[in-house]
Amino acid sequence: MEKRKIILDCDPGHDDAIAMMMAAKHPAIDLLGITIVAGNQTLDKTLINGLNVCQKLEINVPVYAGMPQPIMRQQIVADNIHGETGLDGPVFEPLTRQAESTHAVKYIIDTLMASDGDITLVPVGPLSNIAVAMRMQPAILPKIREIVLMGGAYGTGNFTPSAEFNIFADPEAARVVFTSGVPLVMMGLDLTNQTVCTPDVIARMERAGGPAGELFSDIMNFTLKTQFENYGLAGGPVHDATCIGYLINPDGIKTQEMYVEVDVNSGPCYGRTVCDELGVLGKPANTKVGITIDTDWFWGLVEECVRGYIKTH
């Protein structure tokens, strides 16, 4: 089995933590580094959350702090979903794990420039780090094997009627990424909302046990509450984890190639990913857009990763 080399760029975040857990443990993934961006909460909080998850699960991968602000727009956070810390719910031990001193954008550029073009970027938060890296060093573009991102929607948004949170948090950065010419795979809300984590799924992961089962339960019981209160959903979708699922086995997710453009004009559609599903614009497709996911396969994959953290000695 080929191991996919990835850099996970995230804003932890409840579903980010699940993506981290999967990426660090599955044998099909070679997690080179974790870069942190502001998004679900401010950078100081998302960084602490990422380090806490790494410490709890003994994920021995370097963590780098990145962009504290969007490129242009005023900063927003998703405290209605992720709480005051950005990862409300779990209680962690005192933090001793530290981030690297190198800035995340520099790490991304240096790692890609030294590579053979075999590294996939997996941004599951706002695209600020990725866009700034592209603008600072355009020579990285042909070095990126693929970008598999969580963001956008071809239907309804979740932060505005038009826009999904990750894209709305930094639409100008998203515009840079979607016009970069790099192969893109987009896991938008239309797909990720199919991964609603019900009480039955939480109980299943609790039964699987170990530190990851405990963390999964604490994380998803919190989002069960906030997702129902905000959106009436029967549980919290694990949006970001779908990107890791796709990288492990793309056959579990049906995609459709489309031309996707990010609306950066002020107004009700600011931050919308305009997906030309019918091809009416006649422009060449630039993105594989996730349509449906085999949820039985997906939750089996999550459980496999949860069980991977159980110590046998």
UniProtKB/Swiss-Prot annotation:
What the entry lists under SUPFAM superfamilies is as follows: Nucleoside hydrolase
Q: Which GO terms describe its cellular component?
A: cytosol
Q: How is the cofactor bound?
A: Binds 1 Ca(2+) ion per monomer.
Q: Please give the Pfam families that the UniProt record associates with this protein.
A: IU_nuc_hydro
Q: Which Gene3D superfamilies match?
A: Ribonucleoside hydrolase-like
Any GO MF annotation of the entry:
uridine nucleosidase activity
Subunit relationships: Homotetramer.
* Name the UniProt record assigns to this protein: Pyrimidine-specific ribonucleoside hydrolase RihB
